[in-house]
Amino acid sequence: LEESLKARFARQGQSVVDENVGVAQAGYDYAAKSFETFPVVLPENPHPLAQWAGNEAIGMGAAAAGVKFYAAYPMSPSTGVLHWFAQNARDMGIMVRQVEDEIAAANIIIGAAQTGTRAMTATSGGGFALMTEAVGAAAMMEIPVVMVDVQRAGPSTGVPTKTEQGDLWQVLGASHGGFPRLIVAP
């Protein structure tokens, strides 16, 4: 940590480096004195592990599952899924479209799925709210589609004092009437 702090603050002068190293050391000393040591020792893993962001994993999983059409409107934090598809789709034979809004994204994947193409979109809470009429349309026509809701930490763009999976309630009750749906949430 000390080396990282030195590298990060070197251009700001030795006094800034010393202050940051001192604060980090004081925090470490306080924690060591005030808290018990964590009793679990993780075994070393001799095999390197791949690390992916959640949005990358969504894209990779969708491609592995045979998705051949992806349409979306960029909405944080789901935009990374669109970026992943845009960067990798050509090599995988996947058609990608950035459309004018979330309503268009939902309806265009319904059209693609009606032709037998595995189709998907991703959005976040506000975007999914706009898609709910299309959810009902897909149910009425019995056309299977995949809609990913990359949840924010709370209402709107999130609440700084708490986190939740608030979009889950919206997804569970999306559209009108009862129809089969598969909802997966961590």
Give the label of every model feature segment.
Residues 180-182:
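Proteins synthesized as precursors that undergo proteolytic processing into mature forms
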Residues 185-186:
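Glycine-rich ThDP/TPP pyrophosphate-binding loop and its adjacent helix/strand module
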Residues 3-174:
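Thiamine diphosphate
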